[in-house]
Amino acid sequence: ELFHHWFGDLVTTESWSNLTVNESFANYSEYLWNEHKYGKDFADYTLMKAREGYFHDPSNVSKDLLRFNYHSREDMFGGVTYNKGGSILHMLRNYLGDDAFFAGLTDYLKTNEYGTGEAQQLRLALEKVSGKDLNWFFNQWYYGSGNPKLSYTTSFDPVKKELTVSINQGQTEYFQFPLAIDVFENGKPIRKKVWVNAKAINDF
């Protein structure tokens, strides 16, 4: 609730449709505090547990993060607005990097202080600071619904000494996103950062 001094009071959502602009930050602030106080591993664990609030209700998969048609404002509260929203902020932070992410939040707050804000303005602030086009991210995560359902297979060519990792998306609407793959060689992990395109199978 302390985070609402900034995301909710200093800048408040311009409509119930954009409620996640307030509540996802309150949710994600718990991660930031746990990371600061107890370290990244514990914070990652708490984020994983928080995501269960989204996955617990099967109907959440069909709900957009920003919803412009709803019966009651109470419909906007729940696992999508809070838990999924917080996880999406974490993805955005990892994609942009800490410097750009937090500088973008500062710009958003200063630009809209004592007024209202919406996801569109958050995107513009983050784009301004990072220099990256985030339309694809917001269209997919803020204006869309669902989540990737991933599985993977591996194959090894002994002649070429080449490992292929195939990432399979099991849902009907495909996502694009960066992904880190750890490959172990002689007991030591080698991290490969790849880009998963919006299609059923990606080979790396």
Protein language model regions, located:
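Beta-strand-rich binding/interaction modules
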Residues: 134-135, 148-204
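Hydrophobic alpha-helical and helix-loop surface patches within well-folded domains
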Residues: 1-170
